[in-house]
Amino acid sequence: MISPLLLGEKAVEDMRNKQPTYTWIKVMETNIMAGGLVGGFGDEYGRTAAAHPIHDALTLRAETHQFLHGVKVAYGVLVQLAMEGKWDEIDRLSTFYNTFNLPRCLADLNLNHLTDNELLIIANRACEPGESIHFLPGEVTPQLVVSAIRNLEKHIY
């Protein structure tokens, strides 16, 4: 069986070469269908709980404005996995992220200079009432988010 991550790599390569190949079409169709199904059937409970609130909170910092939405959401996925203690999954995604220059750490987002207090401002925004980050099991606090970010930093380096 071919790894979906390998198909994604081939699809991006084909897109960059302006070649609408079968692989590219199938990967795009899969993304659109899966996103629609998750959003449609799962509603807010089926979405990546922390990734989008992390994205939204990162936009408080001007240093991140040059990055596309999906790039910041990709970082939010890693923060969520760190919050859940899924380090093997982070390792598995890390190679994939490297292939596409997706951020794995604060330095990749020009944020490696942030203090814990500055990270706490970001975490407070991500943890506002009503944010999907609270769909994660257990109590989600800004301190937990900062801790996950710092632990992710240690894990990546």
Model-derived features: where do they sit?
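Active-site segments that bind and position negatively charged phosphate/pyrophosphate groups
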Residues: 1-99
